[in-house]
Structure formats: structure tokens, C-alpha cells
């Protein structure tokens, strides 16, 4: 699977750990964020790059890391069809995929330790929408996804 990853200066260390870990697991990694901490790319520049690549279908999933993960999530979620989830546990990384079908995981480099970040990223990439949920909940969530899509459609199609 091709995975897009990016960070600002605050998320650089964690991003490098996660990128190396996932590459070692066979993921094809593309970095759209800070490549050199001496020449950082701010979160408000890295997140739109990732969001647009998700929108276009060039990538199915992305991982973005800033200080708290929140700035990346806020900016990425401005783009239609992008569902960025700021997570601080492996459980949340799993559930943002299984319940919400998130396509971008955001994490905080000031908050998440390296091994946890690697586990969260792998869980995010290997969990499918409605995976391991009861049948009634799967049906509910598929319907909810359509309703959320209709809300999104009404917002982006105004004017």
C-alpha cells in the first residue's frame, strides 16, 4: 500500500520513526512534509498537500504529525472527502477506521512515543471500515456514512 506521511518541525522525530517502521513492513512511503528540521514545513502547508492527494485518489491513506496532531487535523478536514482523526491511542486509531472510515491519521509528536506511534499507524493502515463490528452496527455505520456524505455534499455544493 502507498502511504503518504508528513510532519511539521514538532512532529519530525515521530514521523521519521513511523516512516522507517512502516517502510520496514513493506509500505511504500511518500513524505509530503518537513524533510529537514532546519527547513521546516508548517502544519498549514503540509496538511493541504496530503488532503489534496487523498481527494484526488492518488493516496488512500495518510499520516500527519505535528505537535499535538490537532493542527494537522483541523487543516486537513477543510477539504471535501477528507476525514482526518487526531488519535492518542491504538484503540482510537482502530476505531477511527472501523467506525468513521477516517483516511488520515494525525498524531502529536509532543504526545506520542515512538513505539506507540508505530503501533497506531500500523493499526490505522490495517483496519477496514466496520471491521470486527456486529452486523447491526456495520449496517448502521454504512447508513451513517451516507448521511455524513449528504451533509458534506450540501456544504460543498452551496453557492
UniProtKB/Swiss-Prot annotation:
Record-level Gene Ontology MF annotations: ribose-5-phosphate isomerase activity
Active-site positions on this chain: 66
E.C. no: 5.3.1.37
Gene Ontology BP annotations: D-allose catabolic process; pentose-phosphate shunt, non-oxidative branch
Gene3D superfamilies per record: Sugar-phosphate isomerase, RpiB/LacA/LacB
NCBIfam families cross-referenced by the UniProt entry: rpiB_lacA_lacB
Protein's UniProt name: 4-deoxy-4-sulfo-D-erythrose isomerase
Species in which this protein is naturally found: Clostridium sp. (strain MSTE9)
Amino acid at each position: 500500500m502507498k502511504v503518504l506521511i508528513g510532519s511539521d518541525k514538532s512532529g519530525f522525530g515521530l514521523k521519521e520513526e513511523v516512516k522507517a517502521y512502516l517502510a520496514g513492513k513493506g509500505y511504500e512511503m511518500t513524505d509530503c512534509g518537513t524533510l529537514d528540521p532546519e527547513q521546516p514545513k508548517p502544519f498549514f502547508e503540509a496538511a493541504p498537500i496530503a488532503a489534496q492527494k487523498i481527494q484526488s485518489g492518488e493516496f488512500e491513506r495518510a499520516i500527519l504529525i505535528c505537535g499535538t496532531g490537532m493542527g494537522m487535523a483541523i487543516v486537513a478536514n477543510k477539504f471535501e472527502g477528507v476525514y482526518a482523526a487526531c488519535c492518542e491511542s491504538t484503540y482510537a486509531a482502530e476505531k477511527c477506521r472501523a467506525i468513521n472510515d477516517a483516511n488520515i491519521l494525525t498524531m502529536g509528536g509532543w504526545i506520542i512515543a515512538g513505539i506507540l506511534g508505530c503501533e497506531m499507524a500500523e493499526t490505522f493502515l490495517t483496519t477496514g471500515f466496520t471491521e470486527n463490528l456486529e452486523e447491526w452496527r456495520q449496517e448502521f455505520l454504512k447508513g451513517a456514512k451516507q448521511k455524513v456524505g449528504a451533509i458534506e455534499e450540501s456544504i460543498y455544493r452551496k453557492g
